């Protein structure tokens, strides 16, 4: 426990396959946004759960690195399976690219949230390209969890601030393609016995589609809802109004 108690920060675990695809190398250093040189020298005793396809194995990372045998060179690999670990994960581009919609949908909610949150923080830290983050979250079209969408929204809104005027319309188009199916699925109207999280998700999706996606149809729908309720006793759902 000393490694966790007597030094600052927490680990970043990087995951990379060798060229043959039969060995996974995990390396650790302290997570840092500013690439502090001291972070490279810090290590922890890190319990790690890894899922390779459907098989979960447990490992203890002691020191700088750990090599794990991989039988299937094309396997889908998830580090921090179950979301139990107190560390961030940075996948090599090849491993990140293997996480497609079907595989992502099968992950637990905390795993999906961590995947998005770790990826965006990797962008902020200069370890991942913004375009790679966008490509990753495009695989979340079937996502219906509010917390995961909040993590996606933080990243997409920040990406928009990085785009030039010529590049921004391309991002808006990709946001529309991602968000529209989810909003269509949950609908614009509050359902019977709907929980609060569903309403908050609707409000978030509408904002993403209408503002960040610059969707003209969604913008017009918002105007019609607002103006259509003026002078009436019916109340617009607060999350949709916001």
Predicted regions and their residues:
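Non-catalytic accessory/interaction domains
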Residues: 2-242
């Amino acid at each position: 426990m000393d490694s966790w108690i007597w030094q600052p920060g927490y680990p970043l675990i990087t995951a990379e396959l060798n060229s043959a695809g039969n060995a996974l190398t995990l390396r650790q250093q302290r997570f840092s946004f500013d690439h502090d040189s001291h972070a490279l020298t810090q290590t922890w005793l890190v319990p790690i759960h890894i899922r390779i396809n459907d098989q979960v194995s447990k490992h203890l990372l002691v020191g700088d690195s750990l090599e794990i045998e991989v039988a299937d060179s094309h396997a889908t690999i998830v580090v921090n399976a179950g979301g139990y670990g107190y560390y961030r994960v940075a996948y090599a581009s090849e491993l990140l690219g293997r996480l497609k919609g079907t595989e992502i949908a099968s992950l637990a909610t905390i795993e999906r949230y961590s995947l998005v949150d770790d990826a965006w923080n990797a962008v902020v830290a200069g370890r991942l390209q913004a375009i790679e983050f966008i490509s990753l979250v495009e695989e979340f079209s079937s996502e219906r969890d509010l917390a995961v969408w909040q993590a996606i929204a933080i990243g997409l809104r920040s990406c928009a601030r990085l785009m030039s005027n010529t590049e921004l319309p391309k991002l808006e188009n990709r946001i529309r393609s991602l968000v529209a199916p989810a909003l269509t699925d949950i609908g614009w109207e509050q359902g019977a016995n709907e929980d609060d999280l569903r309403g908050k998700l609707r409000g978030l999706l509408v904002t993403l589609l209408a503002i960040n996606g610059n969707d003209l149809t969604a913008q017009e729908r918002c105007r019609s809802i607002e103006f259509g309720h003026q002078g009436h006793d019916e109340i617009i759902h607060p999350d949709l109004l916001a």
